[in-house]
Amino acid sequence: MSVAENKSEENDIKTPVLDRKNDYPSLFCGKTINFVRVCINNTGKYKRQKRYKQEYKKENHMNERLIVKSFGPVKDLDIIFKKVTLFIGDQGTGKSCVAKLFSTFKWLEKVLSQKKYKLSYFEQYNRFKTKLCAYHRIDSFIVNGNPYIKFEGELYDFLYENGNFCVTDKGQDIKGISKVMYVPAERSIVSVAENKSKLLKELPDSSETFSEEFVNAKKFFQSGYNLPFEGLRFEYDSLNDTGWIHGANYKVRLTNASSGIQSSLPMCIVSEFLSSKVSDKEEIKLSKEEKDKLEKRVAEIMQNDEYSDSIKDMMIRQLSYANRYNQLINIVEEPELNLFPRSQMEVLKSLVCNNASSDENMLVFTTHSPYSLAIVNTMIMGAKAYANASAGQRRLIENILPVKYQINEEDIAAYRLSSSDASYCQSAINPNTGLVSKNELDSASGDIMRIFNSLYQCYAKTLAR
């Protein structure tokens, strides 16, 4: 087949031709289109590798799978991540460990898709332990025991087995770059530390990264930020590097605010800041070296006469996607920290709203709070009611719980982790109702009430004497 014939066939795909007025900068926008991947053989002819249907569809990353055995507190689990995924369980059952592994693999997918590292880099010299797991300080779990870890992602599969780490490229076209944010339980420290950099350096690397984003978020909301509860407002004095909380009749420095404010403000403001970056399809900041490489690659594509215009357009689109955010992976430890139940609801509504700002976003959180589960059930029920309602009923539902705070039941996964070997990880979703199981909501209160009733019976006997 001649090159001319091949060009004609490729043009039959009817790929939208991009605006070339400003060369490649104008290409860095829009939704993804899968393209025909080609390579040139020794004779200069095209060799087709894969041909993808050109269609817009919901992405498959909402069903990413994690399998873990014998990794620290994590005994044996096989789970699917969805748009909203939550973990509940006692202390020390591995909720945070699972969340940190997910964060690690999503970050790894990100940097590999940007071609910042070769696949072999992380496969060699035990870097999975010393670089990746050490970032979250879960590297010690590899020393003890012989863990098995497998993550089936959108773009790559990762496997750690018998001390070896293996990465497999699934050959998928990228749709954009993820902004992966791990919000640690220690986040209140960034509120009280403010500019005490030495204190922050003692934290895990993940906490230091979160602290940096908190600084960026404070600067972004220079005119102020409204907390989702109690009518409170945060204002940042950049000149003196000081945060202030404004209430109805008072003003207090963030360092002197309540523990609930200190833990929730960094989480909420960073989540909203990053979700806005993703919604705006913000370009990733590149170093001069990275910009030079990008410009060189674009020039190579545009000057190659063997590529048809449609192929050039699609190849440059792929370059654009590798440098533009398209989703926020927001991983939050215990969003309810130090908050009254009513405030817990407002904080969760804020997180869910930010998550809903893009179809690609994902929210993962751990919790100890039965109130959080009840709130999630309210959000699921809101979506179920809205889906079946008439126009008039929908207006009523919107007044009770707006759509931006609702969660479709097919978009949520919930898992209970326990200390029992036999039932370590179980789904907390009732398959009949699509809601978080009533047992998960009532287990703690049931234990408390049983103790109360026993004590009340003892008390009643003392009165009968």
Where are these regions (language model features)?
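Conserved D-loop-proximal element of ABC-family nucleotide-binding domains
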Residues: 340-341
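Conserved H-loop
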Residues: 362-371
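P-loop NTPase switch/coupling surface
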Residues: 1-3, 14, 20, 25, ...
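Extended helical coiled-coil dimerization/tether regions that scaffold
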Residues: 152, 181-325
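Conserved hydrophobic alpha-helix in the ABC-type ATPase nucleotide-binding domain
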Residues: 346-348
